[in-house]
Amino acid sequence: MTVQLLPLPAEHFDDWRASTKERLIRLRQDSGLLPGQDAVEDAERNFTELLPEGVDTRTSRILRIVDDEGQERGTVWFAFKDGRMFLIDAAFDEPMTDEQLDELWELVLGIAAEELVTQISARLFVQDAEARRFLDGHGFSTSSIQMLLQPIPDRDVSAVDVSPMTAERYPSFAAASEAGFASELAASGRLTPDEAAAESHRQFEHELPDGLDTPGQKLFTASVDGAEVGILWLAIRERDDHPHAFILDIEVAAGQRRRGYGRALMHAAEREARRSGADSIGLHVFGFNQGAVDLYEQLGYRRLAELLVLDV
């Protein structure tokens, strides 16, 4: 049984929007990425930002998956920007055969060629088995992973001394952190080096507009016997109306690695998060950093969602 992709008729848009919004909310909530009202607001932003003109938005395509008997089998929603194609949602009414999924993928590649895109990306939630079946085997790489630890355990931090970063240390930290994030963004395959540098600068200015005095931002240095061994940067945010800590940067100094300081810094992050009243702590890790992924999973962090990328 073959499949084809057909544009969503305008008269079906409202029903599609309602069911897709419900699905996006559920994916965020069930994965743990965003709980409660946070998931509702994030899903709503997708429609506001990506479909400002509804079904007529030129930078999005909403397509029905139809079999050769004329039965709708699901929908896919793509957004396009700067030569990239983003799979926002793939909803299957029932499981499809491997052959049908392969046919569907060939149709997707045809759309990519029509739109002259150079990259396809997709956010994959951990529990979305059908979307994973659809994307598996086509050469995607994992650009980044969102992870969460909840509740926050009370673990020993005695291996390192952690203290607030000084004003004297901040400038060199800021330069190294911004440059390091740009390098990792480019290495993840998501952005070109120039795009990565611009995005890193934008995020740094957004998070730390007032440097060390920025509310909700906590920066630390870690030392052993008076020698600096690493840095830690935490943002205190809200998650479902509760304080939530997010690790924005954590790094063991060159020459101090493979001595257990990375694990000790993670324990310190948990302690500082608890001191700020947080009951959960999250992080983002690039997919190529398998050593960090392994450490976080050993510490009890669980995967919530992955960003997949494919150059075409």
Language-model region placement:
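Conserved GNAT acetyl-CoA-binding A-motif
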Residues: 112-125, 274-284
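Acetyl-CoA-dependent GNAT
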Residues: 11, 18-23, 28, 35-88, ...
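Active-site acidic-Proline motif in GNAT/NAT acetyltransferases
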Residues: 80, 92-95, 253-255, 259, ...
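Short hydrophobic clusters on alpha-helical segments that form packing/core surfaces
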Residues: 108-112, 247, 268-269, 273, ...
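Conserved active-site tyrosine of GNAT-family acetyltransferases
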Residues: 135, 140, 296, 301
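Conserved acetyl-CoA pyrophosphate-binding loop and the N-cap/start of the following alpha-helix
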Residues: 96-107, 256, 260-268
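Conserved N-terminal entry element of GNAT/NAT acetyltransferase domains
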Residues: 1-35, 148-168
